Amino acid sequence: MDDEVAALVIDNGSGMCKAGFAGDDAPRAVFPSIVGRPRHQGVMVGMGQKDSYVGDEAQSKRGILTLKYPIEHGIVTNWDDMEKIWHHTFYNELRVAPEEHPVLLTEAPLNPKANREKMTQIMFETFNAPAFYVAIQAVLSLYASGRTTGIVLDSGDGVSHTVPIYEGFALPHAILRLDLAGRDLTGYLVKCLMERGYPFTTTAEREIVRDIKEKLCYVALDFEQEMQTAAQSSQLEKSYELPDGQVITIGNERFRCPEALFQPSFLGLEAAGIHETTYNSIMKCDLDIRKDLYGNVVLSGGTTMYSGIADRMQKEITSLAPSSMKVKIVAPPERKYSVWIGGSILASLSTFQSMWISKQEYDEAGPSIVHRKCF
């Protein structure tokens, strides 16, 4: 596809923003969805201080900034900061003029109508996009796996959803949301490490814990069994070197942390785990399509990257499903970015080119056009 007119694909997650060009097989830019503002005016003398920083720059200067996430639980809650993130995406990360490229954005399942309209309005009025489309994240993940029917468990940093999809359409009545995701697991690991006598208190230190989580945590196939193994020997222990050179040891925390996905009571939440939520979602669907859903359970998002998670899901859902049911868990290696990849695939399809909302259509109908063209 000609780079001049390549569509831009932006997947705005609660934790990370993934952006790039339609037709590429991976996003060109992946950066934290954060906006930072100086805690104290004029601390950094002669640094030419800006009033706000976005993404990696905010992350690296986090010591002197207050960091805010404009996307909470998958939903945009702060539009001024969101605009800053989009501006940064176009001009600093991708280095493109947004008025020259169609823009595909992603949205959380069950995103409020007013939010879709606001996104549409900002893209056309602030950034002058020539064409625009918004697609549901889980649907894109399913496309990326080469399917049009299945149930997607999409778990990122801020929220998890189970989304049953039939022939390319999400079934809204059966979508379930679980407010338990990567950020909560990081917080839980902080608590577990605290009990071990390793205090991590500042936002900067939480980032270290996030790294520990990503590098060392895994999902146990049998939690009780694993706890016994951990108690009896040190074979499950790993060490981690902190930035200051101190080395800490982490044992059963490695699998206790992600176990909260299956047992939210660990976090004090009265919610069903990801396996049960997936099952409940399937049970809200028509009897006739359940077999297709059980046979196509697709994992998506960074919080599904733990080793052992697919086997555990297989075990749990098989025990919930009817005994003769064939259960298949699909865990693509690139699932951290599968929403973005699905967007890249969709936006470069020749059949999709008639689906864009054009600037002209927007000017004639206003923001509500998004409900007619994007579903």
Swiss-Prot record:
Top-level division of the source organism's lineage: Eukaryota
InterPro entries, sorted: Actin, Actin/actin-like_CS, Actin_CS, ATPase_NBD
Gene Ontology cellular-component terms listed: cytoplasm; cytoskeleton
Pfam families, alphabetized: Actin (PF00022)
Major localization class: cytoplasm
An example molecular function term from Gene Ontology annotations: ATP binding
UniProt keywords, alphabetically: ATP-binding, Cytoplasm, Cytoskeleton, Hydrolase, Nucleotide-binding
EC identifiers of the protein: 3.6.4.-
Catalytic activity: ATP + H2O = ADP + phosphate + H(+)
SMART domains according to UniProt: ACTIN (SM00268)
Compartment(s) of residence: Cytoplasm, Cytoskeleton
Family in the record: Belongs to the actin family.
Biological function: Actins are highly conserved proteins that are involved in various types of cell motility and are ubiquitously expressed in all eukaryotic cells.
Name listed for the protein in its UniProt record: Actin
Lineage: Eukaryota, Fungi, Dikarya, Basidiomycota, Agaricomycotina
